[in-house]
UniProtKB/Swiss-Prot annotation:
This is Phospho-N-acetylmuramoyl-pentapeptide-transferase. The gene is mraY. Pathway: Cell wall biogenesis; peptidoglycan biosynthesis. It comes from Buchnera aphidicola subsp. Baizongia pistaciae (strain Bp). The chain crosses the membrane at residues 5-25, 50-70, 73-93, 113-133, 147-167, 178-198, 218-238, 242-262, 267-287, 318-338. GO terms for molecular function: metal ion binding; phospho-N-acetylmuramoyl-pentapeptide-transferase activity; UDP-N-acetylmuramoyl-L-alanyl-D-glutamyl-meso-2,6-diaminopimelyl-D-alanyl-D-alanine:undecaprenyl-phosphate transferase activity.
Length: 340
């Protein structure tokens, strides 16, 4: 398992590092470049000619590494790949519409939400009614030794919001160079450790968590995500040479969501993915506050734009958000000790 984890990590990492420059050149050649909102921070206009849709290579690297190093007879592998590819296609359509029509709107919110929801519902149906693994009707509560049993309808609803919510939250967070990809690495690292423990009878008993037989292979997929994300960061760090686009943010967010669902760690995801939660809540609060008072609470949302407009340098803001995400990852790992 550990050897396959390492090999999966390096396979996806090397694919990103080898093909990244070629993809950047190709995207520049065909003018597949970031569309900047006219009402956004002025500093973002410098990013106008930066190529986008780098998420295509992230998805490709994860798929290749997964096919090579996982056991393809495992149903959890295919459920995860379905979300990765399906959400990637939705993001691809969204990105293409932005580039074709030369605006930052892309798919309408209704169409995007509907497509994401349909695929999420299909996957959830397969999990709860076709595979019907006994662990799917259990819910792990972080920092508590209690496990809630026989809550199928609640679990289904939580699973839906975990997949949809995470995909959109990552999409909202992906607004600055490297801002989203590092928290993705931290969250996935946390999930990889939990999946390794959950897939081992002795370790799951020792840490007082649910034993999930199929979860072993999720560890290998997590390794592929971490490797491809690190490889992407090589080109995405400030000043970015490439952006992942919606094809990357929606697919990675959805994949993190489905992995947390399969591990019964949706509530923990709220903690370790707290940065994504903060970004999303800032948008929701802004909308509600404006509807009630007709005034803006923040200068601009997601909240990282608010700090930008307040004069915080982009690099300082990004690193501070990374620090927050790292602390949240450690907090998630602390849960394992509390569960004992």
């Amino acid at each position: 398992m550990i050897i396959r984890f390492i090999l999966s990590f390096f396979t996806s990492l090397l694919l990103m590092l080898i093909f990244g420059p070629h993809l950047i050149n190709w995207l520049n050649k065909y003018k597949i470049q970031q569309i900047i909102r006219n009402f956004g921070p002025k500093s973002h206009f410098n990013k106008k000619n930066t190529p986008t849709m780098g998420g295509i290579l992230i998805i490709f690297s994860i798929i290749i590494s997964t096919i090579i190093w996982t056991k393809l007879s495992n149903p959890y592998v295919w459920l995860t790949l379905t979300i990765l590819i399906g959400y990637g296609i939705i993001g691809f359509i969204d990105d293409n519409m932005k580039i074709y029509y030369k605006n930052s709107k892309g798919l309408s919110s209704l169409h995007k939400f509907s497509l994401l929801s349909i695929l999420a519902c299909i996957i959830i149906f397969l999990i709860y009614y076709i595979i019907n693994d006994h662990s799917t009707i259990k819910l792990i509560v972080p920092f508590s030794k209690n496990i809630i049993f026989n809550t199928k309808m609640i679990c289904i609803l939580i699973s839906y919001f975990a997949i949809i919510g995470t995909s959109n939250a990552v999409n909202l967070t992906d607004g600055l160079d490297g801002l989203a990809i590092v928290p993705i690495i931290f969250v996935t690292t946390n999930l990889s450790i939990i999946s390794f423990i959950s897939g081992n009878v002795n370790l799951s008993y020792y840490f007082n968590t649910i034993y999930i037989p199929y979860s072993n292979e999720l560890t290998i997929i997590c390794a592929a995500i971490i490797g491809s994300s690190l490889g992407f960061l090589w080109f995405n760090t400030y000043p970015a040479q490439i952006f992942m686009g919606d094809v990357g943010s929606l697919s990675l967010g959805g994949t993190i969501g489905i992995i947390s669902v399969l591990l019964r760690q949706e509530i923990l995801l709220i903690i370790v993915g707290g940065l994504f939660v903060i970004e999303t809540l800032s948008v929701i609060i802004q909308v509600l506050y404006y509807k009630i008072t007709k005034k803006k609470l923040f200068k601009m949302t997601p909240i990282h734009h608010h700090y930008e407009l307040n004069g915080c340098p982009e690099t300082r803001l990004i690193i501070r958000f990374w620090i927050i995400s790292f602390i949240l990852m450690l907090l998630g790992l602390l849960m394992l000790k509390v569960h004992q």
